[in-house]
Design a protein with these regions (language model features):
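Active-site helix-to-loop segments that bind/position phosphate- or nucleotide-bearing substrates
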Residues: 2-179, 186-190
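Glycine-rich/acidic phosphate-handling loop/turn and adjacent ATP-lid/helix
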Residues: 193-194
Length: 194
């Protein structure tokens, strides 16, 4: 690869990332050879089949959508299939998780002053990650009650759910899962949510 006037040698991950960027390779369609239909979360599969109103078998639905593909006579989940339907996608895709940290105060402290008061990691299929992280974040946010102009007590959340949930959904949907290092981290401070 050229960088300015010099050539630099790329490692395997950098080459693969470049191929994804150039659309020479499709991350979601790649097969996870160690996987099988046994890795499917049946609760999510059942819900999906109800939503699309089909009587097809799980295998037929997954194959038709490109989430289950054959290689050497055996069927394996694609990376998209694992993210959407897998029981434990982070086994195969380490960045497929969301960690929520709640801090005491307005800054992140470490060492003897560490101020993390809640720490939860969610690492199921993307649907369940969103569902469980949403429930947990809601349980950690404050609500404020005040008397409105009509003389009625009104309770409002610390942050509107539609706003922070949209941010979470965007982070999960637009995450580069080909990067095996970092996962999504949500930080809750006394004065903000990151």
């Amino acid at each position: 690869c050229r960088q300015g006037d010099s050539s630099i040698k790329l490692n395997a991950n950098q080459i693969r990332s470049l191929e994804y960027d150039r659309k020479e390779r499709d991350f979601e369609a790649e097969i996870i050879l160690e996987s099988s239909i046994k890795d499917i979360d049946m609760e999510v599969m059942t819900l999906y089949k109800e939503r699309i109103d089909t009587d097809l078998s799980d295998e037929e639905v997954l194959k038709a959508r490109g989430f289950l593909r054959e290689k050497n006579g055996e069927y394996h989940l694609t990376k998209a299939g694992m993210l959407l339907f897998g029981k434990n996608p982070s086994i195969y895709l380490p960045s497929a998780r969301v960690r929520v940290l709640k801090f005491e105060g307005t800054e992140f402290k470490v060492g003897t002053e560490m101020n993390i008061i809640k720490d939860r990691t969610f690492d199921k299929c993307l649907f369940k990650i969103l569902e469980q992280a949403r429930e947990f974040i809601n349980s950690q946010l404050r609500e404020f009650t005040h008397l409105n102009t009509d003389g009625v007590f009104e309770t409002v959340p610390e942050y509107p759910e539609f706003a922070w949930y949209e941010g979470l959904v965007n982070a999960v949907c637009h995450r580069d899962y080909s990067n095996s290092g970092e996962y999504i981290i949500v930080k809750l401070f006394d004065d903000r949510l990151e």
